[in-house]
């Protein structure tokens, strides 16, 4: 009478465990990818809401904007003097959001802050919410173009009506 398992039986069990584990790894990677994408989408929405609320402060002559990094008076005065305040507005927004949101895809060699005022068109831009300023036009002080790449490739014209599936975009008028 034999006791124990043969080598072939043990190899079959190990092979079955390996196959089951591979399904688990694939599913786990899918869950991680979905969570990162959801976090990038949430970051984008939060930045758009924040910038929109700050833009509303100009008409109300609220004073301090973007956590005190700029004032509505500075923006209006610069615009009225035929200047372009949008670069300073962008810098104020990025500074105000510094440290509050992290890029779920990692630092990409740029840093862990999810909000930046530079970049676009490279794989390292994945997950970053980028704020691009546009100066005065059509009677407006300017526009903050806020866009986030949520999957590769991170290239293309994000301002296209209807947009690209992998790029979230919201323009905020000032």
Please tell me what each predicted stretch does.
Residues 33-62:
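Membrane-proximal N-terminal amphipathic helix
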């Amino acid at each position: 009478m034999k006791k124990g398992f043969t080598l072939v039986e043990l190899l079959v069990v190990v092979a079955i465990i390996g196959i089951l584990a591979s399904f688990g790894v694939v599913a786990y990677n899918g869950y991680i990818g979905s969570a990162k994408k959801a976090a990038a989408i949430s970051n984008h929405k939060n930045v758009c809401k924040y910038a929109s609320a700050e833009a509303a402060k100009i008409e109300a002559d609220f004073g301090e904007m973007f956590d005190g990094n700029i004032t509505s008076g500075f923006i209006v005065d610069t615009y009225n003097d035929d200047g372009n305040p949008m670069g300073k507005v962008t810098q104020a927004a990025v500074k105000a959001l510094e440290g509050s949101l992290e890029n779920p895809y990692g630092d990409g060699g740029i840093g862990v802050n999810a909000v930046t005022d530079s970049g676009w068109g490279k794989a390292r831009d994945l997950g970053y919410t980028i704020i691009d300023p546009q100066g005065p036009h059509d009677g407006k002080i300017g526009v903050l173009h806020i866009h986030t790449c949520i999957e590769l490739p991170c290239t293309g014209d994000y301002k296209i009506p209807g947009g690209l599936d992998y790029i979230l975009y919201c323009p905020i008028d000032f």
